[in-house]
């Protein structure tokens, strides 16, 4: 016998989206609520038995009422049992939405740091979980746990951190996972899907977040789904994000920034959020970022441009001129040659551009 599950985590509902305009941020929050409905439809259309939500559904303890209502409605519409393990951003407390909201009957919220077992005899399955009850959890919630040796399929949902033993966010170890006797461990906290891993008989994974919220959450985001049986889990990653965050480096050496950017862009970007970093060499005028942004902004949901170019060698060659320009360039080139970092060299190049523009009576 097997059960079909969906594993998701780290929704961070009602995030601020501070890098976007106020209207774009409002739209992204609306889309985050719409994500819940899309997830509910996916669960029902694909015959899912169990939904495991591994914490940080909320970004903070300040959540819009319409978001709570949308979440409750979406989860209640799922023709599946739903299990939630609160995380460090949304710990369980008497004042948290997990305690104050009237949740649908098919939703179970784990409320204690002690692992709880919920039996589902009709599925021959047991679901285990535990909760953050404060923003930090110094000790592993999995320490000392082992599932009984019975005929049930054993699933667990936790918010925790395997990456560092000194973590303050439920520091899990591979040894604890191996000794747990769990068939599938659904984890939250890390926002990047890192593949399916195995310790002993336990398959475990981080689903990552279903939608990126910033340039530290790049690329495709989604959920995990598949089947679990005794000692075996077969799941796959399902892309679910409406928009992606991407960072693109564009070398402008020997060509205009506009042509270089056109050549580097993929076909479809209008739904996505991009940071373009221009690199390489330019002439003394540098880049007109405002003009580039005006030209390309309609091709994106949001566009951010960064100039990390440097003055070309042909400009520095003019340091040999017997003029004020030459003297200025010689002074800066001396500093440029002994600079200890790319960031310092970039600042010197920028100073050279502004200085040359001032000498020529031009604006940048």
Enumerate the language-model features and the residues they cover.
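Accessory, non-catalytic peripheral segments of nucleic-acid enzymes
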Residues: 230-364
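Short loop/turn motifs at secondary-structure junctions
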Residues: 47-48, 124, 181, 270-272, ...
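N-terminal active-site segment of His-dependent metallophosphoesterases
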Residues: 1-70, 347, 353-356, 360-364
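Glycine-rich phosphate-binding loop signature in dinucleotide/nucleotide-binding domains
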Residues: 43-47, 121, 149-150, 267-269
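His/Asp/Glu-rich metal-coordinating catalytic cores
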Residues: 50, 59-205, 209-220
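Acidic/glycine-enriched edge-of-secondary-structure segments
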Residues: 20-31, 126-131, 242-255
């Amino acid at each position: 016998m097997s059960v079909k599950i969906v594993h998701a985590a780290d929704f961070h509902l009602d995030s601020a989206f501070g890098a976007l305009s106020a209207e774009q941020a409002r739209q992204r929050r609306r889309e985050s609520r719409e994500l819940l409905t899309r997830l509910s439809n996916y669960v029902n259309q694909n015959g899912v038995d169990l939904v495991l939500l591994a914490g940080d559904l909320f970004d903070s303890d300040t959540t819009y009422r319409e978001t709570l209502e949308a979440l409750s409605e979406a989860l209640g519409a799922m023709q599946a049992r739903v299990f939630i393990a609160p995380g460090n951003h949304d710990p369980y407390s008497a004042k948290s939405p997990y305690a104050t909201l009237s949740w649908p009957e098919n939703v179970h919220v784990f409320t204690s740091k002690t692992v709880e077992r919920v039996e589902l005899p009709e599925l021959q399955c047991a679901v285990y979980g535990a909760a953050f009850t404060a923003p930090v959890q110094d000790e592993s919630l999995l320490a000392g746990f082992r599932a009984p040796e019975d005929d049930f399929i054993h699933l667990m949902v936790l918010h925790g951190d395997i990456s560092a033993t000194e973590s303050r966010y439920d520091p899990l170890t591979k040894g604890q996972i191996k000794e747990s006797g769990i068939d599938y461990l659904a984890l939250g906290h890390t926002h990047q899907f890192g593949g399916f891993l195995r310790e002993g008989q336990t398959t475990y994974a981080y689903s990552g977040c279903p939608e990126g919220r910033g340039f530290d959450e790049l690329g495709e985001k989604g959920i995990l789904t598949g089947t679990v049986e005794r000692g075996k889990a077969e799941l796959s990653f399902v892309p679910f994000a409406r928009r992606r965050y991407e960072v693109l480096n564009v070398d402008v050496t020997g060509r205009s920034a506009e042509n270089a950017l056109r050549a580097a862009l993929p076909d479809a970007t209008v739904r996505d959020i991009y940071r373009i970093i221009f690199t390489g060499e330019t002439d003394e005028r540098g880049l007109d970022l405002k003009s580039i942004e005006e030209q390309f902004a309609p091709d994106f949901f949001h566009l951010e441009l960064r100039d990390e170019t440097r003055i070309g060698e042909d400009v520095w060659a003019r340091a040999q001129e017997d003029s004020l320009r030459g003297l200025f360039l010689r002074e800066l080139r001396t500093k440029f040659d002994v600079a200890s970092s790319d960031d310092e060299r970039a600042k010197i190049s920028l100073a050279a551009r502004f200085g040359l523009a001032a000498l020529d009576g031009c604006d940048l």
